[in-house]
């Protein structure tokens, strides 16, 4: 059993609002089309299903630090990044303020792949081989760094 040392859940408000409005509008037009016509609006149904899938995949960002892994996952957990605690180089941990135009979601930036639900504060930690990084949006960077240090110290003893 893995011991959870830190857990943060960030709701992705923007994607939830956009998807909810889109799904509601498309459902309204689907029902209207079915009442007024005998044809089935397959395109609207497909678009509605697409927004439902997007909503399920991206409705939240969860950051979990266990005794063995640092994990950042979106939605139900199909899109995630998982790095072993021992691979992270805590000395490279730094807060990064990203520009608003980098956007939100999974972003490929000059700093690395960012898992982001809002603009503002982010935490960037490189791995010891400098080939990968743990780059997430958070306002609790110091708590994550503390949890990572504790997990690394516990695994080294």
Please state what every model-predicted region is.
Residues 36-47:
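Hydrophobic alpha-helical transmembrane segments
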Residues 45-46, 53, 127:
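Short hydrophobic/aromatic segments of transmembrane alpha-helices and their interfaces
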Residues 48-50, 108:
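Short acidic (Asp/Glu) patches
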Residues 72-135:
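Non-transmembrane, membrane-adjacent beta-strand/coil modules in membrane-associated proteins
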